[in-house]
Amino acid sequence: LAQQAGAQIGKCFSISMNEYGGANTKASITYAFRPDTCNDAMRLPVFGGLLVDAEGGRFINEGFMCERCMFAAEPVVREGYHYAIADAAFMNRLATEPVSDFYGDARMKGMFDGIVLSDLLEQFDAAAEEGWAFKADTLAEVAEHFGLVNLVATVEEYNGYCESGSDEQFFKDAAYLNPVAEGPFYAVQSMPAGWLSLGGIKTNAAGQALDAHNHAVAGLYVAGADADLFTSPYY
């Protein structure tokens, strides 16, 4: 609408991806944020368990999802679709133990203190019905469903790291080395999700939209994330 009124788009447009958030457009609520705001299965990638790319290979130190979310988004954006893989033992723990038990970072522990995902298994079934989660008795079935051609080999290698207590690939903290060994096996498909777009309509210092000649468009003001000024110099 602003462009139709004669305003120009600034040159600092981008997407804010500096933190990770689970998301899938197939889900009835597409984005995971605060507790009780989405299907809890969407949170599976942020508990330090195994994450794989679209071919079934690891691509990140999964502990970053728990403790260093500012570092987690770039690999996720690069990979696109990614999958959290868990076994029955891990899922049962998530459904019965406080979420804070899965985090080593004190800030995260405080944020989720006392919260238990007691409806996780039922919500996972709902996610499977929507098409963004899948459960099977074997890893091979999970791999076939999502086309994760390297998943079985990846899990075999990963379980070796869990047994030894040393991640030789991404050097994840041993506290997050939970094996994927006991069926049934669970997979949750996620896609990148950003907070907002950065940049937009070019404005002057008074927030007035500018036209192609940098003259103010009468009566048109732009603020916040819709304005180019928000990105540069303030963001």
Task: Please give the residue ranges for each predicted region.
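Residues forming the flavin
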Residues: L1-Y235
